[in-house]
Every structure is written in structure tokens, then in C-alpha cells.
């Protein structure tokens, strides 16, 4: 993961703190999509530091990134009486939503949860077929509708079916939509409202899948979605060698939305709960002594 950032950082760690290093760090952070605020703060701290070794530089950057994630809302723990727990998955076209829904179902099933997968993407028959195949492979319950049907009604039926059949988790996959399409964005509000009618407090989690390769372009998408429905957290998809990593920290600092999961690869197992320490270990190369 993050080969771009790791390779550049390795070169940076071999330099003493100087004007050239600060300029290189500034360029790197901008290239890696950390944005103006974080980049300027990094450079300011580099200028103030007295010690010029690789470990100091790494520690300085690590502290800054940790600080950017401070004060984020934590996911309220669901009461043991709340069953099923409903997770609504939304995002733009091509962000890997349906595959992520399957990975999330696998994640919960590995933790002894019974999962109902609900496919509401009535605009794309292939999307519903894909979700059905995943559900069959995973042994999940499955509810879908007819092409062109009412997505909110399907969500309602899915939750009601899960309640009747005793499922502990419901994952609702929605159709991909661009953040600039007003009517499709309004549909999300309707789905959220109808979920609450099917089960009080639902949806308990609203996750947005974010294509990590989009970089800064993802920030405005997340902001618009968050304005329409309150996002509980983000699931970054396609986190591989081409992903730069900085967008996650920008969104956390600017929009106060936490990252909940990281998705990489095509396997159902390729979804991890976001762990900051593990993430930073993968983000940074091993520090060599100067």
C-alpha cells in the first residue's frame, strides 16, 4: 500500500533538516493529497525543530497526522436490545459499493453475525444480480426489488424481513450516484426516513464508500453526501499502491468524519477495520539511520 508516499518519504528521511528538505516535504505532502492546512503545519513544525535526523522527522509527521484525527465522533455502541443493526451503504458510481457490501457482510459473518443483504440499486440490474451472487456465496439472507422500483420501499421490506427472520445485521446497498445529481441525492434522505419507519433508530450506521485513488476530488463528494445524510463513517476502497493516503486525514480534519474500514484487493477478506497504528506503519517506510 501507498508505494508512492513510502518511496518519497524514504528519500526524505535521508536528508538533514534544511530549506531543501522543507521544500521537498511540502511538495510530497501536496502530491500525496494532504491539502494546504496539513502541509503548511508540517512545514512550520519542520522549521521549528532543532534535531535533524530521520526518526525526528518521522515522529513529527506522525504526531501531526494523529492530531488531525483527534476529536472525531466515535460510533455509539449499539444496545444488545437493538436487533437487527442496520448499516446503509452509499457512494458515487464506481466506488466499489456493492463489493464493499459483500466484504462487510463477510466481516460480520466472521464475527458470528447473521446478515441480511438488501439490494436497492434498481437502476442497474447487474448490480442486483451481483449482490445476489455475493449473498448466495456468503450464505446471507437477500432482499431485492424489480428494476425501476422504489429503493426506499425495498429497504423497508428488507428490514422488516430481517426482523421477522431474526437476523442480527442488515446491510443495505444503494445505487451509485453523483453528488451533483440533486434528485438522486434527495432519494437518500427518503431511504433514511423509511428505514426509521421500518425500525426505530435505523439506519444505525451510514457508511460512504470512497475511492481512495480520487485524491482531493473525493473531498467535495463526501461533503455533499454528508450535507444530505449524516455519515457515520467512511470506507476507503481501492487502497493499493496507487493510493496516496492524504485524503483520509484531510477529510477527518475538515469534515470531522472518521474512517471506519479500509478496503483493498478483490477478495472478500480484503476489508480491515481502520486501525491508526497499523495504517501509519504501512504509510511510513522503515527509518534508516542517517
UniProtKB/Swiss-Prot annotation:
Its main location: membrane. It comes from the Bacteria. Its EC number is 3.6.5.4. SUPFAM superfamilies: Domain of the SRP/SRP receptor G-proteins, P-loop containing nucleoside triphosphate hydrolases. InterPro entries: AAA+_ATPase, P-loop_NTPase, Signal_recog_particl_SRP54_hlx, SR_rcpt_FtsY, SRP/SRP_N, SRP54_GTPase_dom, SRP54_N_sf. The keyword Transport does not apply. It is an enzyme of class 3 (hydrolase). One of its GO terms (biological process) is SRP-dependent cotranslational protein targeting to membrane. GO terms for molecular function: ATP hydrolysis activity; GTP binding; GTPase activity; signal recognition particle binding. It is found in: Cell inner membrane; Cytoplasm. Involved in targeting and insertion of nascent membrane proteins into the cytoplasmic membrane. Acts as a receptor for the complex formed by the signal recognition particle (SRP) and the ribosome-nascent chain (RNC). Belongs to the GTP-binding SRP family. FtsY subfamily. PANTHER family: SIGNAL RECOGNITION PARTICLE RECEPTOR SUBUNIT ALPHA. Part of the signal recognition particle protein translocation system, which is composed of SRP and FtsY. HAMAP family: FtsY. This is Signal recognition particle receptor FtsY. It comes from Chlamydia pneumoniae (Chlamydophila pneumoniae).
Amino acid at each position: 500500500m501507498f508505494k508512492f508516499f513510502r518511496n518519497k518519504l524514504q528519500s526524505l528521511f535521508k536528508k538533514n533538516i534544511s530549506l531543501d528538505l522543507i521544500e521537498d516535504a511540502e511538495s510530497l505532502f501536496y502530491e500525496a493529497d494532504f491539502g494546504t492546512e496539513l502541509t503548511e503545519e508540517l512545514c512550520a513544525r519542520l522549521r521549528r525543530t532543532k534535531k535533524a535526523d530521520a526518526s525526528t522527522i518521522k515522529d513529527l509527521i506522525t504526531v501531526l497526522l494523529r492530531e488531525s484525527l483527534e476529536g472525531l465522533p466515535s460510533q455509539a455502541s449499539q444496545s444488545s436490545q437493538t436487533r437487527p443493526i442496520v448499516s446503509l451503504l452509499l457512494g458515487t458510481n464506481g466506488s466499489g459499493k456493492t463489493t464493499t457490501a459483500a466484504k462487510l457482510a463477510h466481516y460480520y459473518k466472521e464475527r458470528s453475525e447473521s446478515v441480511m443483504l438488501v439490494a436497492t440499486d434498481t437502476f442497474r440490474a447487474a448490480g442486483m444480480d451481483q449482490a445476489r451472487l455475493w449473498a448466495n456465496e456468503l450464505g446471507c439472507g437477500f432482499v431485492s426489488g424489480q428494476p425501476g422500483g422504489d429503493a426506499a420501499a425495498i429497504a423497508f421490506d428488507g428490514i422488516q424481513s430481517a426482523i421477522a427472520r431474526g437476523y442480527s445485521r442488515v446491510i443495505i446497498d444503494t445505487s451509485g450516484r453523483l453528488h451533483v445529481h440533486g434528485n438522486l441525492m434527495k432519494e437518500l434522505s427518503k431511504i433514511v426516513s423509511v428505514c426509521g419507519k421500518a425500525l426505530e433508530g435505523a439506519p444505525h450506521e451510514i457508511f460512504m464508500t470512497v475511492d481512495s485513488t480520487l485524491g482531493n476530488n473525493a473531498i467535495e463528494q463526501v461533503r455533499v453526501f454528508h450535507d444530505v445524510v449524516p455519515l457515520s463513517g467512511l470506507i476507503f476502497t481501492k487502497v493499493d499502491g496507487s493510493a496516496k493516503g492524504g485524503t483520509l486525514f484531510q477529510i477527518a480534519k475538515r469534515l470531522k468524519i472518521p474512517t471506519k474500514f479500509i478496503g483493498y484487493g478483490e477478495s472478500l477478506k480484503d476489508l480491515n477495520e481502520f486501525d491508526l497504528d497499523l495504517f501509519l506503519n504501512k504509510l511510513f517506510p522503515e527509518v534508516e539511520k542517517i
